[in-house]
Structures are given as structure tokens and as C-alpha cells.
Amino acid sequence: MKKKFVPILAAGALIVVIICFMLLGSIIEKYTPSKEHMNLSDYYNLSGEQDVALILDNQILDAKGKLLNGTVYLDYETVCSYLNDRFYWDHNENKLLYTTATDLISADADSTSYYVTKDSHSLDHPIVKADAQTAYIAIDFLKLYSDFSYEVLDSPNRVILTTAWGDYTTAPAKQKTQLRQKGGIKSPILADIGKNMEVTVLETGDTWTKVSTAEGIIGYIKSKALGATSTKTLTSDYVAEEFTHIKKDFKINMAWHQITNADANTTIASVLQNTKGINVISPTWFYLNDNNGNIASLASSDYVNYCHQKGIEVWALVSNLENKDVDTTSVLTYTSKRENLINNLISAAIQYNFDGINVDFEALSSEVGDSYIQFIRELSLKCANNGIVLSVDDYVPSSFTAFYNRAEQATFADYVVVMAYDEHYAGSEEAGSVASIGFVKEGVANTLKEVPADQLILGMPFYARVWSETPVDDTTGADSTTQTSDNNNNDTDETDNAAADAQAADEAAGTSDSADSYQLFTLDSYATSMSEIQKLISTNAAEPVWSDIDGQYYVQYENNGITYKIWVEDAASLEEKLKVLQENQLAGGSFWKLGLELPSIWDTIIKYIN
């Protein structure tokens, strides 16, 4: 029997030994670090010989550069997103532009030459290359006008970009170790780290620490392999240019003067007769008249001379709204057309001797935002060279108008005007104030996030809207809808485009405030003057009620079964808005438009803008 058990015991022992060896092998496998080195081209996701990895401030970008004939190029979108959004690519005329405080830099695609205004300069390679999708800009040219540093490395091709200046943390390796793609010994090795090799510490952990090397490789090192940390400082040698502005040594008290024909210029004396304290007037003289940047003009030397005799500056307004056949986008997106428009405006300023230009371009699409800002930049240079004040009119800030880039406007223009009115407009689905105090305060506060107070002018209304709610016969059982029209024979509104665009966007997003229930009336409105509002109140024996929420009087009355609602603009409501101007120490105020105000309103205005 014993002899029979010997083979069984031997076999069992062998099995145990095998199992032990298997377990030991498994344990060794589990705790043995991987020696696999990852291909860095795969790590950077490079797919071609021309591809260049971009490492920006210790982050690997999805975007790639291009290595063309030994020069690194970055695509236009990457440049604007990460390095410098002041570059402008004209895809229609294949021209790269950059605007400084004093010069317009330009380079044509595939050219080694570039111009600083009229002075020619050159590099030993093309400055910009273009294809059907975008433009690629030489990195050394970008560096001339941008606050970043770069280092070009090969094997594989990559560029280390730095834009974040200040303190950063480093640590030396206490021993030879490995930099791995992820935190774990089984993660592939990205680089071998020598003893005392210094790395930048990005994120510390108990077991693994995220670091970057001087070669732009980002990964993880065992925390215990690192020595004591130290703080170092990155500094930039870039000298930021200074932008100067024409700033008046008085508070701006400006009023827009709507001029619809040449004969209207002769009314200037009567229009100014009952005003007080006006020091700037903005006549609506110019508008885009074709797709080549030519303008229609209603300018008058006699008008300017009269205003100058009264100590009033003339800032002529240029608009894009009057000629509906003009494609503003076509004008703004061609450098040659912008140049023609600007030259026409400057020539008119010199010819008629007016003091400033007030740009009022409205109803733009977001796609033209960059081109519009480039227009403001280019116009500002010509204005500055000729001592002409440049001001720009803007809607109150919203997500739908962010592309107007008020911060960049303020960098180049002398003044920015926030048109704090048209809160409710001809297309509104509900009756409401033209400019409630909350709307004004919010508009000013949000604009001040981008525009310095000493450059911001508050635009205020001299008009109000009369809303009428006419009952609808609902006996048919048909769905009743709210309809709004603008029976505006007084032509008092500047525009309702921004508000209408915002409403359309709301509806597209499903966030419109319109009610789902049937509204048993049609809604109409028209804008009219302060004096006309007072007549309506008196004629209908209406009782104004002060609204603290709106910062103005509210009136409601009925006539022939129709309900009328008015949020009154008068001295009381205007004073609330002027307090906002004063409290925020703004550059001044402006009013739309002359002729709609009560003469007594000026006594209130000069209390705050003297």
C-alpha cells in the first residue's frame, strides 16, 4: 500500500510546486515594472513628417503645427485661440494683418516681405502660407508681435510654447528612474530620467507625481524618486506696447441728431436753442451706400461751423442700416473695401472739419465679428493720425453680442457708447419699458467688465413706447396670438435689431419667455417723444404711478376698449439713469435723439453732466 501512495504524493508535491511557481511568477509579473518605451510620435499623435506637436504651458494641444522647408508654422485658429487674437486673416484677399498702437502690419500669402504701414521688411522664408481651409503663420513672425517664448525640438518634431509667466515648482530626481505615460508601473515609459535631472512639478500625489521635462514630455514619476521641491520664476522679455487715446478734459454731454436729408442741417440752430450743456453733437450724416465701401453723405460745413461757434464738437455718425441693398459683411471682410470706407470717412472729416467719427454698425452676425473689430482697429489708426475722436456705439452686453468685443474696441477707440435702451422694442412679445433702471444698471456693469469707466459713455433715451392691447374676438375658438407692430411715424428708434436677434436666439434655444396659453389681445406699440407722452397722459386723465423696480412712472388707461400702457421717460426716469452715470464715474452721457426731449430735461442733465 505504501508503495502505491509514493507516486501519488510525488505528483501532488509536483503540482504544489508548479502552483507555487505560477503564483510566484504572477506576483513577480504584477510587481515588475514595464520596460516598454512608448513611441513619442504616437504619444504626440503625429501622423506625418510635416506634423509638429504643440506643447503649451505644459499641456499638449490637439492642434498641430506644420514644418515647411525647415520653418515651423502655426495655423491661424490656434494662433488666435492661444497666442494672440489680434492677428487677422483676410481669406478673400489672402492677406495677414496685425494692428499695433501706431501701425498696420501686412503680409501677403507666400511672400517673404511684410509691411509696417508703408515700410518694407522681409524674412528668409514665407511669412504666411495658405490653403483652402486656413492660413499658417511662421512662428518667428508671430513672436515679433506676441508675448510668448518657444523652443523647437526634433525626434519627433515639437514646439514648446510658454505664455504663462510667474512662479513654478521644480524638483530633481534622486536616482535614475522613468517617466511614464500614466501613474503605474505597467504604464509605458516615455523617457528615462537621470539622477539629478530637474523636472517641473505639475500635480503631486502620494505615490505618483505628474511632471514635465525640459523636452516637453509630460507624464508621471514615482513620488519617492523626487527630491525636495524649489520655486523658480519665468519672466518674459516682451515689452507690451502702450495704447493712447484722445480723452476730453470734460464730461461728454452728447446728443444724436437724426439727419435724413440735407435740408435738415439747417435746423441745427432751432434744435440747439432749448438745450443746455451740450458739448458734443452726433449728426447721422453717413451710411454705407454700396458693397465697395463707398458712403452716402449729408455732411454740411455750415452745420460744423455753427456748432464750433457754440463750443460744440461734431462727431459725425456712420451707419450700416439705411441702404438695405448693402451687404455689410461683404464690405468688412475685404481689406481693400475697409480701406476704401476708412479713407472716405477720413477725407470727409478733413473736408468738413468735424471733430470725431461715431460708428454705429448694428445687426451684424457673429461670423463678421473679427472683421468688424479689424475695421475699428484700422479706422482708429487713421483717426489718431488726424486728431479725430473715434467713438463706437454698442448694445448692452449679452451672449448674442459678445462678438462685438468691447474690450478690443476700448483698446483702439477713444470712447465706447453703451446704448442702454430698446429693452422692449417693436418686436417684443410683451409690453415693457424702453430702459428700466435695472436694465441700465446691468448694461453699465457688464460693459465696465470690458471698458474702462473713463472711456464709457452711457446712451439714454429721449423717447418711450406707447403699448396698446386690443381685445381679440375669441368666439371662433381660433388660437389667438400676440402681434406687435411699430407704428412709428416719429422715427424715434435707432434700431431694434439687437433685441430682435436676441429674441430669435431665445426661441431657437427653447428659452423664450412667451407664454404657452392663449393671449386674448393683439399687442401693438409705437415710439414717441416725451412731450407726446405727457399729452397722452393729460388727454386721457391717466394717473402715473411710480415704479421703484423700473425707476420710472407707469401709466395705464383704456380708450374704446383698448388698454394702453406706457413706461414714461421724463426728468424723473432720466435722473435715475444719470445717477448710474455719476456713481460709476463714466466719461459722460449721450441721448437719442435731439428733438424728442422736453426742454426742461436739460436742467436735470446738467446737474450730472456739467
Positions of predicted regions on the chain:
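Catalytic domains of carbohydrate-active enzymes, especially glycoside hydrolases
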Residues: 265-289, 345-357, 580-588
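Primary recognition of N-terminal secretory signal peptides and signal-anchoring hydrophobic helices
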Residues: 2-205, 234-248
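Glycan-binding loop/region signatures in secreted carbohydrate-active enzymes
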Residues: 236, 464-577, 609
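Boundary/entry segment of secreted carbohydrate-active catalytic domains
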Residues: 176, 222-269
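Chitinase-like catalytic core of GlcNAc-active glycosidases
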Residues: 249-257, 275, 287-437
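Alpha-helical scaffolding within the catalytic cores
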Residues: 235-240, 262-270, 298-303, 340-347, ...
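Acidic/aromatic/glycine-rich contiguous surface patches that form carbohydrate-binding/processing clefts
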Residues: 577-610
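SH3/SH3-like beta-barrel fold
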Residues: 98, 196, 209-213, 221
